[in-house]
Amino acid sequence: MTLKQVIVVRDDLKLSRGKLAVQVAHAAIIGYLKSDSSLRRKWLDEGQKKVVLKVKSLEELLGIKHKAESLGLVTGLVQDAGLTEVPPGTITAVVIGPDEERKIDKVTGNLPLLK
């Protein structure tokens, strides 16, 4: 069983690279803290595989979150404090996992990579 964590970010917000990096870092930590301890240990041992993908809207992001939760996957939302680029409370990303790669791919397999 191969594990990974997927972070999906909103491309419509047009965040700066630095801001985007911080949102992805927040998401990775949220997913780690919410995951089962046995999965967390295995994921760490495997090298902490992460993939960052993008969606075009908040609605699409929330749909991905709902689909992941319906499959029993751990998720978490990142909401920005609003101190720099976006208003307070803006949802910028969702994290899925870490969990089994094949399970996460059922939710995110068709999403484009963030480049």
From Swiss-Prot:
Alphabetical UniProt keywords: Cytoplasm, Hydrolase
Record Pfam families: PTH2 (PF01981)
UniProt entry tagged with the keyword Ligase: no
Intracellular or extracellular location(s): Cytoplasm
Enzyme kind, highest EC tier: hydrolase
Catalytic activity, as annotated: an N-acyl-L-alpha-aminoacyl-tRNA + H2O = an N-acyl-L-amino acid + a tRNA + H(+)
Chief site of localization: cytoplasm
GO BP field: translation
GO annotations of cellular component type: cytosol
InterPro entries: Pep_tRNA_hydro_II_dom_sf, Pept_tRNA_hydro_arch, PTH2
EC numbers on record: 3.1.1.29
Stretches that traverse the bilayer: none
Gene Ontology molecular functions: peptidyl-tRNA hydrolase activity
Family the UniProt entry places it in: Belongs to the PTH2 family.
Role: The natural substrate for this enzyme may be peptidyl-tRNAs which drop off the ribosome during protein synthesis.
PANTHER family: PEPTIDYL-TRNA HYDROLASE 2, PEPTIDYL-TRNA HYDROLASE 2, MITOCHONDRIAL
NCBIfam families noted in UniProt: arch_pth2, PRK04322.1
HAMAP family (alphabetical): Pept_tRNA_hydro_arch (MF_00628)
Protein name according to UniProt: Peptidyl-tRNA hydrolase
Biological source species: Archaeoglobus fulgidus (strain ATCC 49558 / DSM 4304 / JCM 9628 / NBRC 100126 / VC-16)
